[in-house]
Amino acid sequence: MGKPTGFQEFSRQTVAYRDPLTRIDDFDEILTAPDEDRLQTQAARCMDCGVPFCQSDTGCPINNLIPEWNDLIYDGRWQEALERLHRTNNFPEFTGRVCPAPCEGACVLGIIAPAVSIKNIENAIVDRGFSEGWIVAQPPATRTGKSVAIVGSGPAGLAAAAQLNKIGHQVTVYERADRIGGLLMYGIPNMKLDKQTVERRVNLLRDEGVTFVTRTHIGKPEDFPQGHVNQIMTERDQRLTFLDPTQLRKDFDALIMATGATRPFDPTARCPGRELSGIHSAMDFLTRNTKSLLDSQLTDNAGISAKDKHVIVIGGGDTGADCIGTSLRHGCRSVVNFELMNRPPVERAASNPWPAWPTIQRTDYAHAEAEAKHGADPRAYATLTKAFVGESGRLAGVKTIKVDWSKPDGRAPFTEIHGSEKLWPADLVFLATGFVGPEKTTPDLLGLNMQNPRGNWETIAAEHGAFTTSEPGVFAAGDCRRGQSLVVWAINEGRGAARAVDEYLMGYSTLPAPGITMASV
């Protein structure tokens, strides 16, 4: 422990964002450059905890060695801190930018004071590692002669690929989009995660021996989902290749399904006027925008433009905030965010004790931007969408009603508050209401069993820790197995699945995985 009294001497400070009114003029990353001296001071706030809950079940899902690298940063030993960080996290430059940081919610210091700024420190470590040239390709010295196919190039698929390649297996990753990265590339906008950051890591994996195949759908042409965001990304070049998953299984020694949860949940499906033009899924909006940005700096007019439009985003969370931020950068006339739940408390409620994730009021980057631009927080809480209204088939407004929850935590049914009806002007509506599971055509072709772990959600049946499906040699990891979740959980799943595959192929494994502590391979 570098400074035993650091948590008493120093207050929490975080890396600043660029000015809201400046950053909405571009899609550059919102983070400013960190002050490394300040970060060393922040690392000193890490306490000598008897039990570091930041690494517990309620903390970091990949068991990052947070106290260790905080201590090393305080001592100025950045390269050693990077080695500790990479032991448990293949992609700290992703989690350091987009993770909500459950580790900070479980920080022991958080009981009496603001938590250690773990996420900022993590991001600074890996960014310095790249800038100093410490992070270089390390291909395996020998190959095992075994081959693994991974379907999906999101964080789960990439983490599995990194681990399996590192141990010497030949890995091929299939992606139906035109760029590798899955959610990291097209689901998270550039101002939160610059795509050069994603491509930098993908190129590193390629240099280490991972093979990437894009524009390839694992399934039949007739089963390709109509109107899906990936079809949008391929319809212009007409270069999509189709591969039979059963043949893929025969061609490789093992197969990992890491396809994500891409079937959107639409709570407005039965609302009058749902068929009106102008209502889109959040992923359609964000994906089209990022592709247009990368292809042409938005000059090809291939995206959904919010310029001069009244925009309503239905659903909170990160995706809802990203729709707000993207709409502001387009130059929308107004933006409102409907949230069905009540406004959270400013501080933890008695029913939400530490070290559980704190359900409190937060202002995300996009909320701050909307307030700076339009003068008010864009969120309308306890608001239920009742109907869409329009003219000549085109959306013109949204009817809502306020709801009353019988319990503040929202676990009991709500009642509508009569007399609270309102008509909101709307030219565009984006549905940021989550996902119900993976597309089922490829699992069906492989004969995989499905399960319903959470209500309407349906995922590929594969036990956590084993990741084996109903078909020998076929594994599942990430959101397609777990259900929609965080990038850090996807990395957890990818690392765990990699170890399971390695054990299947070799009879044993020396690969580390969450919950299994060993030196980096």
Q: Which residues does each PLM region occupy?
A:
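Glycine-rich dinucleotide-binding loop and its adjacent helix/turn
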Residues: 124-142, 203-214, 264-330, 452-470
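A conserved FAD-binding loop/helix module that cradles the flavin
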Residues: 320-325, 330, 480-511
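Glycine-rich Rossmann-fold phosphate-binding loop(s) that bind the pyrophosphate
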Residues: 151-155, 315-317, 479
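FAD-site-proximal beta/loop scaffold in flavoenzymes
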Residues: 275-308, 394, 406-484
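Ferredoxin-type iron-sulfur electron-transfer modules in oxidoreductases and energy-metabolism complexes
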Residues: 23-42, 64-97, 101, 112-142, ...
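Beta1-alpha1 glycine-rich phosphate/pyrophosphate-binding loop at the start
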Residues: 5-32, 44, 63-75, 83-85, ...
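Feature captures the FAD/FMN-dependent oxidoreductase FAD-binding
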Residues: 80, 142, 147-151, 199-269, ...
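Conserved hydrophobic helix-helix packing surfaces used for dimerization/oligomerization
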Residues: 148-150, 171, 311, 474
